[in-house]
Amino acid sequence: ETIQAWYRKRYQVELDTETEILSLQGSQEGLAHVALALCDEGDIVLIPAPSYPIFANGPKIAGAELYEMPMLKEYDYLIQFDAIPEEIAEKAKMMIISYPNNPTGATAPDSFYEELIQFAKAHDIIVIHDTAYSNLVFDGEEGKSFLYYAGAKDIGIEFNSFSKTYGM
């Protein structure tokens, strides 16, 4: 209930304590295990490049194939969904993203999340959002919860971590 209240206050997101909140030893554990739970041998997982190592390692352990989505400075380090080949998008099982991003520090605007949800729904892709750095932003930027956006709960899972924010 404490996490539920925190998400409501911080992100204006309503979560069900019975079906939408799970406490883990850490978000890294969750990121690794979600790939084991959802991916089969040969599934394609879309990951940002560069990215935190567990984004690749979890799916690799599950036997999935990786497709790297470049995060380029010219696009403010936002993934360009139209750059993902259609044949890859159609075969992809899961996409892992992280905003605010590690290692670039980039944040994503509302339009990015809306496009992400539309893209994932169109291609039946499960979105995994790592929002561990949502409270470590600068220059007036704001870390957001992917779950705030309409349709996100239908296609995605979000991992958060208090250890980054509170130095635990």
Predicted regions and their residues:
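Active-site PLP attachment segment
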Residues: 147-168
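Conserved coil-to-alpha-helix start sites within the AMP-binding
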Residues: 27-31, 51-55, 166
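A short helix->loop->beta-strand "cap" motif at the edges of active sites that frequently abuts
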Residues: 43, 64, 122-126, 153-154
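Active-site phosphate-binding strand-loop segment of PLP-dependent enzymes
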Residues: 72-144
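Short acidic capping loops at alpha-helix termini that bridge into adjacent secondary structure
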Residues: 14-21, 41-44, 91, 153-156
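Conserved PLP-anchoring active-site segment centered on the Schiff-base-forming lysine
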Residues: 37-59
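N-terminal small-domain helix-loop-helix segment of the aminotransferase-like
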Residues: 1-26, 33
